[in-house]
Amino acid sequence: LLVVDASAMARSAAAVVHGYSTFDPRVRVGGVVLNRVGSDAHERMLREALSPLGVPVLGALRRDGRLAAPERHLGLVPAAERRRAAGEAVRRLGEVIGRRLDLEGVLRLARSAGPLEGEPWSPEAPGPPPPGARVAVASGPAFSFLYEENLELLRGAGAELLFFDPASSEGLPEGAGALYLGGGFPEVYAAELSENRPLREAVRLFAAAGRPVVAECGGLLYLARSLDGREMCGVLDAGARMTGRLTLGYRRARALSGSSLAEAGTEVRGHEFHYSAVEPAAGERPAWEVEGRGPEGFVAGGVHASYLHLHWAARPQMPRRLVRAAAGVGA
């Protein structure tokens, strides 16, 4: 099912659909949905242009600013920061789709697809889980960028997840054996994070005791001494600042030393997406050797901190390693 942004198209929409339909013979385009259509006349022109292709048009959605999601420096403003507006937009979108899409046609198209190849993905780890593993996970608006599958993999490896908000929680969750500080927007909430001194001190002491701490991107900034002059946790001997320059791209990397997350030599693929810099970019024991870019990140005691966002389903041994460390079993 191909969704086409038709806002600036008429007959050229047919060229786009024809290109997608013929580019890869393994892919069958079984239907088209036209998005951001301007008017009835615009829709008629689009349908007439597409008719000779024989690809059914299963719907046409009108341009509607009330359905647009606001943007800022790292993409869309998260739904967690605009729950009421986001909920209303989803409700309205459902009404529009119900009126303007051939939902029965979409279902028929889905049923016509062949079976997927390969084994279904499962977050469950083989073998018995280590007892008593509890992982504290940073949440709240400052740390809202997490792959849900990463959390499923932690649970599948036997961990109980304990959520806390670094901007407002008074302390770390009781009984936590490891910390997971994901990505997010610490720069937007730097004042709140800095003002929560008891929580910052709890994180610092947790790391100083050699306990497992995994941080990526926003979590890396939070572990630094400071972020744009505001005090952070001081776990890492590094300062963080916003630069106004975008760092974006996919990365290949290799773990340079063993840590609470990765065994030395582990190869991963991930991505970076930020407007910040950490100085120095790597510690005495870097987390990764990034292909074409050099050493990056920090490994110190139980801490593994890096800019790389990783989807752990590609390396399920990593969340299992973290859960074992949280349970005190060892890697």
Name every feature range the model reports, one short phrase each.
Residues 186-261:
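Cysteine-nucleophile active-site neighborhood
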